[in-house]
Structures are given as C-alpha cells and as structure tokens.
Design a protein with these regions (language model features):
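H-loop (His-switch) and adjacent beta-strand-loop-beta switch element
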Residues: 163-176
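ABC family nucleotide-binding domain
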Residues: 1-166
Length: 178
C-alpha cells in the first residue's frame, strides 16, 4: 500500500490521486518529479547517505530537483527538529532519534502535500518515538500535510486522527479516534 501511495509500485486497477494528480497515469520521469516534490518519505531505517552531512542529507531532494536550498528554511527546519547544533555531523555521529529527525527533515524540505512514514519509530525508544510522532502531528497541523503512518505500535495508531487496520490485505477497521 505504501509503495502504491508513494508511486513506487503501480496499482493493478483503479487510480491513485494525490493533490489532484492521478499518479498512476504519470510516466516514470513525471512520477519521479512528482514524488520528489509532493511526497515526503520517512523510513524505519532512515536511509541517510553516510558520506553526507546532516544538512546535505536534508537538502538532497532540493539538489536533485536543481533547486538552491533556502538557508532560512533550513535554519528554521533544523531548529524545529532539534538539529541546529548537528548540521555538519555525519549520520554515524548521531543517535537513532537524531538520524530519524534528519530523515524527517529530508522528507519535509519541499513542504510536500503527503507524508508517508513506514514504521518511523520502529528503531527508537519510547521517548524519541513520542517526540517523532509529535513532530509529524505538528507538521500536519501547521502545514496541512496529510500524514500516513504505517505502524504495528497500537499507542501510535491510537494517537492518530483516524486509524485504518489492515489484516491479510483487507481493511478490518476504519474509524476516527477520539
């Protein structure tokens, strides 16, 4: 499901409409551009490039899109993520929570319409897990981004506005959380 929503896999039927664009009809080049500009991906295992600094990892989507990073945006985002003092560090010099924040920064740098998070707290302790979820909720509120989180952690699922439970490929629960 996450791969279909992220434009990595193609649906066998139907369509996938994100921010008014049917991504299932885009060619590979257009899809790559759309994904880079409109979809933020956060992975359980961070997928940071080990030889790039925190700032370089965060701004990579902009550089791939031929855009010059806005220093004021980077400064504000790094402050929000608690990374201001770590921008020149390499990933191996960071804690797991800090690495996940870099991953979130990279996903947010283009202010995407859709954020897809695959087990974003799976490798973190409970304190860092709650901080990461709070950050995602904050960006949802402040920037109107849709955030879809794939998780096996019931406490994280219950903190969402809406929960859809899928078992063996079928929706077994779809409801608003109170």
């Amino acid at each position: 499901l996450l791969h279909i929503l992220g434009g990595v896999d193609t649906p066998t039927s139907g369509s996938v409409v994100i921010d008014g664009t049917d991504i299932s009809r885009l060619d590979e080049t257009a899809l790559a551009i759309f994904r880079r500009r409109q979809i933020g991906l956060i992975y359980q295992f961070y997928n940071l490039i080990p030889i790039l600094t925190v700032e370089e990892n965060m701004t990579l989507p902009l550089l791939l899109d031929g855009k010059k990073p806005d220093k004021a945006v980077i400064k504000e985002l790094s402050k929000t993520l608690g990374l201001s003092q770590r921008m020149t560090f390499l990933p191996n010099q960071l804690s797991g929570g800090q690495q996940q924040r870099v991953s979130i920064g990279r996903a947010l740098i283009n202010n995407p319409a859709l954020m897809l998070a695959d087990e974003p707290t799976g490798n973190l302790d409970s304190r860092n897990s709650h901080e990461i979820i709070a950050l995602l909720r904050r960006f949802n509120r402040e920037h109107g981004q849709t955030v879809i989180i794939i998780t096996h952690d019931e406490s994280i699922a219950l903190s969402a506005d809406r929960t859809i439970a899928i078992v063996d490929g079928k929706i077994v629960k779809d409801g608003v959380n109170g």
